[in-house]
Amino acid sequence: VQTGYTYTMNLNTSFSGDDNLYVRLKSGENGSQWAVKETYHIETKDWSDALSVDKMWYTFPVGDNITAFAGARIENYYMYVTPSIYKPGALKSFKLGGNSNFGASTDVGFGFKYETDGGFAVASNIVDKNSDSNGLMGKTSVSKWDTQVAYTTDRWHVSATLSDAQNWTSQSYNATSLGAGMKGSDGDTTGYALRAYWMPEEVGTAVPEISVGYDTKKADTPAANAAKEADSW
């Protein structure tokens, strides 16, 4: 029998009533047995008993239709129009396919989301894992820039996302075997993601909710004997 624990504290602060400064503190000690689980980021995180800042970003409105994001510890998928019925924690783990274009690592990032009352939306954001030492969007940046176009109603959603990664180092995270093979390249990839979901009019009936997705990702300069392209669904 192996045991462990996790502790999470979510802090939300508003200065105007329309903005929000979000900080997530997290601690835990669970050992290596949790590191390979697909639900690792939902159930626990191994901080060796230290209470640390796990997430931190600021959200504020720009006019009536734009929401802006900026933070020292943020991920791409927090700045999208939600492309799945799954909640954000599960979205990161499942991603509707291995090595999805929605994967990212927590670091410095910023972006915006434009939403109309009719359901149309556009979102674009970038996260840079190397910004602390080399600044944002430079030649040596370890970054992922995603742009999404979406249409959402009360019961269904469709979206398409372009993901451009530079020197990316997380190709193998939660990936299929083929997707993990792309880690041998220089990290530059171009990917496309399609998402859709549908919910029945009445909740709790025998009619299921449906959420589907398809991703394709191609290495810009694949290494020898490394995967050039990976698909997932």
Kindly label every feature range from the protein language model.
Residues 118-119, 140, 148-233:
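Detector for outer-membrane/organellar transmembrane beta-barrel domains
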Residues 41-44, 94-98, 134-135, 175-183, ...:
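Extracellular loop and loop/strand-boundary signature of outer-membrane beta-barrel proteins
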Residues 8-11, 109-111, 135, 145-148, ...:
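Generic recognition of flexible, low-complexity loop/linker segments
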Residues 33, 78-80, 132-134, 168-171, ...:
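Extracytoplasmic/secreted cell-surface and envelope-processing proteins
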Residues 3-5, 50-54, 104-108, 141-145, ...:
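Residues that define the transmembrane beta-barrel architecture of outer-membrane proteins
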Residues 2-131, 150-154:
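Outer membrane beta-barrel
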Residues 47, 138-139:
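Charged, low-complexity surface patches
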